[in-house]
């Protein structure tokens, strides 16, 4: 960010990233490398606002190296369609007062970019992801899949830019 005199950086949906090799969390017969959300990098402590109103479905502190750190998942209902949004790599303090079932208004501060020591050891950023079906998961859902799993995961996790509408600004 400093080299480009930028306040924020954006990482896109469906990017095939080799940087996940740094964590055993993404290892296996076939390494997970395909990104399922949008990342927004910036200074630790940057406020995170709810993109849509919704109910707190679940939250967790996913503390493994390379994981999300503090994570919040909201449940949304638009007409007859229910879906979730995941906010990852937040500050641990952000989940200390949450409770499941609480309503969050659109534009409400729901978190802050966490420091590396609490966000999975990543540079401070937000991972934002849309998820149709959580398959009974609470406070966590894969943000990266293998190439061979792409069709299933991309079908369940549409491009988060459908909500954020910000990739048009990426050069």
Regions found by a protein language model. Give the residues of each.
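Polar/charged, compositionally biased leader and regulatory segments
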Residues: 1-39, 43, 149-171
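Short, glycine/small-residue-enriched coil/turn segments at secondary-structure junctions
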Residues: 28-65
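Histidine-centered active-site/metal-ligand motif
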Residues: 35, 76, 89, 125-127
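Terminal peptide-recognition signature
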Residues: 40, 54, 74, 107, ...
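Short, conserved secondary-structure segments in the cores of folded domains
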Residues: 44-47, 94, 100
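Zn2+-dependent peptidoglycan hydrolase active-site motif and core
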Residues: 50-94
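Flexible, gly/ser-rich surface segments that form the specificity/activation loops bordering the active-site cleft
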Residues: 57-71, 108-125
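Acidic, glycine-rich catalytic/binding loops that coordinate metals and/or anionic ligands
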Residues: 96-108, 115-118, 122-171
């Amino acid at each position: 960010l400093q080299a480009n005199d930028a306040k924020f950086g954006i990482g896109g949906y469906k990017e095939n990233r080799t940087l996940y090799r740094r964590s055993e969390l993404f290892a296996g017969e076939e390494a997970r490398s395909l990104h399922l959300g949008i990342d927004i990098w910036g200074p630790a402590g940057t406020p995170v606002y709810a993109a849509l109103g919704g109910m707190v479905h679940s939250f967790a502190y996913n503390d493994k190296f390379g994981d999300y750190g503090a994570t919040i998942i909201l449940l949304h209902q638009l007409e007859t369609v229910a879906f979730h949004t995941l906010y990852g790599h937040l500050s641990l303090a952000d989940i200390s007062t949450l409770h499941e079932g609480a309503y969050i208004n659109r534009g409400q501060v729901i978190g802050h970019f966490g420091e590396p020591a609490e966000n999975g050891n990543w540079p401070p950023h937000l991972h934002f992801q849309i998820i149709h079906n959580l398959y009974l998961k609470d406070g966590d859902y894969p943000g990266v899949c293998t190439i061979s799993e792409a069709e299933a995961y991309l079908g369940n996790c549409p491009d988060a830019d459908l909500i954020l509408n910000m990739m048009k600004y990426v050069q």
